[in-house]
């Protein structure tokens, strides 16, 4: 029997022989993923951080206001790559095997990746960045459809050097960063640009997945980038949230009817904070990470223009989850955030600002954990420049979108194994000004659970009871209607239970004692 890689090679060859000259040529697809970045952290979503390249994409393309991820790094990556809910792909939690198929910690053989599907359709398949859906062979990117790979197989790591126990790879071989001159965001970009230069000039279209680690902790950034922001956050998180919310309303990203959520009760009022200078430094380094991410995305876009591919390259940008409230401080004592010997996160109060106007964070499935910026730009596909889209989208839609644009066929079987049907819808109609219609979407992570059905959202913060919100009137989830509408709660809870059973969702109690994972 052919193994997965041999099967792909044979199918790719067949596709090359039988492929007809397309007019117009099928689009290149560049999918850019940020890590642990909040809803309001880039300029075109209300931020003060300088992100001119992403802002320009939004001005010339479209922005979604209601696009969702799965609240955590590994599950989001599994869903993006497969078009399935993470449990269906085997990554219901993180990369640890929890003893049941839906939580095995790596992509299973009942799913296919975008790379596997597009490669059989004649695309060159390229990846640079964070994988985090399979630590060991044969579960690396080159085992799952990518011809070329550079990046971090594992989760978060020091930006300046590889943390002990973390893995990087070049194609199918381990790779170690040089002792000097390495910075993770820049390195991911270097290889993304190199791959476009090498494979973007040929007759075949290409798919590039650029999965950055920025701005995930630890807070590491170039001194010149930090310098731009140090001192700018002495105004504090309370004022920052108000300013971002005001800009979001002016932009049309947020409805003025939706109140800004109160400051998280665990975050102190800024005027009571004693270590303000240290807090300012932390947010300045975080902003510098976002700034550098945008600079490097600019390098990717410049290379696309250089090879003459801008007109027919779809560029998509989004984040894997909301801002992260985890408190991390394990670097060398006395070293501030930024250099290699530091190891900090920016903490809950700044994460609360990152997720403006929503509440809660990465891990949770309230809007603060799952709402992401989403930008799509392609002159030949996205016709309405600067449009703000209020359609509901989800990362499961990315597989269907890529299959649609590539003229590919999503398989019922692959390498002799039955493949689960896609869960998402193609976003191409939205790119062309049409509607996707009403839909039901589901979430579960660490016992936190949610259902969205049209304007209604049923959500629970584990181990609490269900809450019900009308997101059309109350996107910031301030007015719980569950007590007033028990019938709707019961019906949506029934829908959730059916989905959970179908997808192999387990409660924390069923999985046993939870193990902390770096993500």
What are these regions (language model features)?
Residues 2-462, 466, 473-494, 498-501, ...:
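Formylglycine-dependent sulfatase
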């Amino acid at each position: 029997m052919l193994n997965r890689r041999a099967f792909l090679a044979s199918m790719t060859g067949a596709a090359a022989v039988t492929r007809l000259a397309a007019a117009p040529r099928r689009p290149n697809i560049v999918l850019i993923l940020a890590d642990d970045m909040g809803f309001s952290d880039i300029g075109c979503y209300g931020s003060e951080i300088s992100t001119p390249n992403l802002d320009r994409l939004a001005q010339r393309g479209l922005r979604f206001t209601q696009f969702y991820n799965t609240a955590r790094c590994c599950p989001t990556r599994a869903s993006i790559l497969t078009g399935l809910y993470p449990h269906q792909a085997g990554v219901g939690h993180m990369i640890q095997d929890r003893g049941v198929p839906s939580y095995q910690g790596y992509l299973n053989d009942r799913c296919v990746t975008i790379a596997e599907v597009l490669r059989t359709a004649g695309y060159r398949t390229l990846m640079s960045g964070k994988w985090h859906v399979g630590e060991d062979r044969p579960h690396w990117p080159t085992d799952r459809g990518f011809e070329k790979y550079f990046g971090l197989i594992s989760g978060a790591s020091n930006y300046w050097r590889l943390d002990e126990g973390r893995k990087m790879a070049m194609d199918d071989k381990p790779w170690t960063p040089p002792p000097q001159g390495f910075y993770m965001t820049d390195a991911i970009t270097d290889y993304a640009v190199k791959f476009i230069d090498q494979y973007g000039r040929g007759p075949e279209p290409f798919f590039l997945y650029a999965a950055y680690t920025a701005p995930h902790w630890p807070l590491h950034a170039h001194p010149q980038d930090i310098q731009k922001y140090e001192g700018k956050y002495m105004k504090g998180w309370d004022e920052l949230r108000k300013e971002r919310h005001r800009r979001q309303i002016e932009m049309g990203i947020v409805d003025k009817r939706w109140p800004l959520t109160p400051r998280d009760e665990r975050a102190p009022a800024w005027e009571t904070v004693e270590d303000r200078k240290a807090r300012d430094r932390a947010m300045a380094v975080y902003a510098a990470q976002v700034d550098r991410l945008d600079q490097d995305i600019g390098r990717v876009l410049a290379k696309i223009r250089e090879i003459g591919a801008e007109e027919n390259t779809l560029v998509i940008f989004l984040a894997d989850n909301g801002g992260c409230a985890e408190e991390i401080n394990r670097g060398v004592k006395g070293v501030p955030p930024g250099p290699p010997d530091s190891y900090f996160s920016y903490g809950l109060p700044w994460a609360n600002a990152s997720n403006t106007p929503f509440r809660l964070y990465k891990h949770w499935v309230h809007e603060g954990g799952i709402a992401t910026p989403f930008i799509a730009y392609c002159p030949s596909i996205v016709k309405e420049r600067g449009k703000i889209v209020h359609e509901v989208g989800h990362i499961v839609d990315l597989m269907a979108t890529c299959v649609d644009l590539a003229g590919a066929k999503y398989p019922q079987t692959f390498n002799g194994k039955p493949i689960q049907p896609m869960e998402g819808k193609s976003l191409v109609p939205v790119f062309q000004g049409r509607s996707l219609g009403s839909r039901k979407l589901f979430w579960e992570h660490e016992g936190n659970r949610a259902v969205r059905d049209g304007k209604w959202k049923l959500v629970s913060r584990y181990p609490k009871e269900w809450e019900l919100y009308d997101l059309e009137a109350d996107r910031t989830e301030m007015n719980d209607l569950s007590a007033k509408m028990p019938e709707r709660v019961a019906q949506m809870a029934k829908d959730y239970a059916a989905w959970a059973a179908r997808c192999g969702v387990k409660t924390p109690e069923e999985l046993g004692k939870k193990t902390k994972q770096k993500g």
